[in-house]
Amino acid sequence: MTTLTGYKSTILTLCLLSAWVLGHAQENEKPCLPVRDIPPSQMAFQAGEKLTIIASYQWGVVNTDVGTVSLDISRSDSSDVPLFIARGRIQTARFFNAFFRVDDYYESRFYRTNLRPTYFMRDIHEGKYTIQNYYNYNQDHTINARIIRKDGSVQDTLLPGRICTFDFITLFYFLRNLEFSNMNPGDVYPISFAIDEEIFELYLRYDGKDEIRVQGLGTFRCLKFSAQTVAGVVFDGKEDLRFWISDDKNRVPLFIESPVVVGRVTGRLGSYENLRFPLTSKIK
């Protein structure tokens, strides 16, 4: 069974992953999450959108912001096929750098029509741990992956992807464009993404509509989702990760929470720019 045990994530990396994708790892083949061409008028985001998620750690009386996750998206017209380019940056707050410094960079290029990835890279610096991933996605859905580790060793491998196998930056934008009107509470959706030299097969559950207050932004109508975390060095595998996205056409992540082995991690939307649609989910 494939698990995330031993995967060297930090609180900030987990907040980015947790925004959409952590769940139960399984061995058997799963049905694919539907991949479809999305009419431009229905796209949940636009070039120029910028989101900042504030990551926090809670344990007993300790409740502190530890860093930020920043995401922005632009368009590329330099290739024969129009693409989106999404970039992510994860950084610890200055005071936290003395304990454990994180400075991670992600970049993904994907089709503007169906949001399928063509290229992905990540450059990870977490304490003394560093790693780089470079992926090129092929027409047959396999992935040419190059993994470069701290000692300079290079691993080239071919990953057996499927049409619904994403990198987790592209997955973030793809999932915002699901056909939410067809969802019912309790519906479960398969998710597949690549990281390092592995493919992870996970599940996402829709839990229905809710309201949530986001510090500094207000109260919003939202859609609530959950996923079962995988037991390992950070999660205990006993409780669900939960997250809330805006119940409007933008589908932006508002709040994320998950128990960890010691304490709890959360991520809340801190700021946003250039949303495609009015944020009509805001109540007050």
Q: What are the roles of these predicted feature ranges?
A:
Residues 1-11:
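Bacterial N-terminal signal peptides that target proteins for export
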Residues 27-138, 180-284:
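Acidic, serine/threonine-rich low-complexity disordered tracts
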